[in-house]
Amino acid sequence: LNTATKEELMTLSGVGESRADSIIAYREENGRFQNTEELMQISGIKEGLYNKIKDNITV
């Protein structure tokens, strides 16, 4: 999550251009992710999506 490009984020199931942009914006505004669960702090990323992608992401 801390080094992924927009294109890399978009390879995750359920993550399109808008969500990838939101992840990058969150990272730029708040600094590095401390854990993967922090992803759910982003608007539009709920527990269901997190559970679908959590095995494919790391900080």
List the predicted regions and their residue ranges.
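Extended, structured, electrostatic nucleic-acid-contact surfaces
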Residues: 1-13, 25, 29-32, 36-41, ...
